[in-house]
Amino acid sequence: MISAIGMVVRRELLIAFRRQADIFNPLWFFIIVITLFPLSIGPEPSLLARIAAGIVWVAALLSALLSLERLFRDDFQDGSLEQMMLLPVPLPIVVIAKVVAHWLLTGLPLILISPLLAVLLSLDFNTWLAVVMTLVIGTPTLSFIGAIGVALTVGLQKGGVLLSLLVLPLYIPILIFATSAIDAASLGMTYNGQLAILGAMLMGAITLTPFAISAALRVSVN
């Protein structure tokens, strides 16, 4: 089972590296959104630090949404999705592997460029650490929850708008607790409670969403 997950993840990474725009477009979008705020409201360190939580996570939500649509769509169009359903491993395992690969290509780069965010938004070390921790816990949850919307709309020709309407309301709890943790860190307060809730959301998403995604994919294919 682990070898099957590794095989699917490796396949997804190889395909993505052949189409590097799929990797860099969400990343550039994230950087551009972050950069626009200091340019628009002025380079006032105290103001930027105060609104940094909202800036980072709104940009992260939008960049995640930008990359979601292709999660299953290409496989659906070329017939690979049906072949995956015939693999001698449960479909939820294949789904987990694809979502993990999606996070490695979209969520992990956001974490790696977080030091740049600290410079652009005038974050101190504790606030930056909270940003990193919320991104590490929260971005995989975005991928798992977003994959449900992709699976439901994979058979539609122009499902981008519907995907946004389905997914964005489900992202709101993650946005609330992630920004709350960053705000608490900027004030020198503890934010273990917010991280615990985000961790519970991630565990719930890993446990439950693969089955919902698999059911939605079977409906879409049939």
At which residue positions do the language-model features occur?
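Long, hydrophobic alpha-helical segments
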Residues: A52-L68
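Hydrophobic alpha-helical transmembrane segments that constitute the membrane-spanning cores
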Residues: I96-L121, T141, I145, A178-T179
